[in-house]
Amino acid sequence: MFMKSGDDIPNSFDLSSLRLLGTVGEPINPEVWKWYYKIIGKEKCPIVDTWWQTETGGMMISPLPGLETIPLKPGSATLPVPGIDIAVVDEFGVEVPSNTKGYLIIKNPWPGILLTLWGDDKKYKTVYWSKYTNCYYSGDYALRDNDGYLWLLGRADDVLKIAGHRIGTAELESCIVSDDNVAESAVCGIPDE
């Protein structure tokens, strides 16, 4: 939202004490990432764009501050943290080729993992562990590029069905905010009666 207001507002503040920038919650658009890095971080602060869920108990994908030898890519959450084995798979659980959209899964249990849902162990196993054998199903779309970097593409269940096509809400939101007259957008489906 700051980006659409121009550079004057952030440039009117002394941001020299910043050492690290963070973003979490939704995939970050590469253009926004570049602006954030240049204008807010003054091209000196790494951006820690993390992926995690409450159920994972902590960050699963994140650039690690202090490891500047791993270059950042605008819009990518980078790589799994050490010890986390992530894959991007198709609907049958087969790993997809690089640069192909698929489901983000975690192959093995890890410290901090949610062990059950309060009062509903069956739902926990059904929602998170039954779609792919012995793998945690995140419910998110992602792709892995040729360098192994992960690009989060939004929720798999956050999809609109329009004229026989499945379109992700995050894709529409990115398209809408590409218009200079739009600061923010949120897309949600409504039933077609």
Regions flagged by a language model, labelled:
Residues M3-L72, D85, G93:
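Gly/Ser/Thr-rich phosphate-binding loop
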Residues S17, G83, K123, N181-E184:
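Glycine-centered tight turns that cap/initiate beta-strands
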Residues L21, W52, L104, G148, ...:
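Hydrophobic, well-ordered secondary-structure elements that form the walls
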Residues G25, W52, T78, D140, ...:
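Active-site glycine-centered loops adjacent to acidic/histidine catalytic or metal-binding residues
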Residues T69-S76, V127-Y128:
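Short, P/G- and charge-enriched loop/turn segments at secondary-structure junctions
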Residues L79-G83, V94-Y128, I167:
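Conserved ATP/PPi-binding loop(s) of AMP-dependent carboxylate-activating enzymes
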Residues D85, D90-V94, K101, N146-D147, ...:
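Residue-level recognition of short loop/turn positions
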Residues W110, L115-T116, T126, N134, ...:
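AMP-binding/adenylate-forming catalytic core of the ANL superfamily
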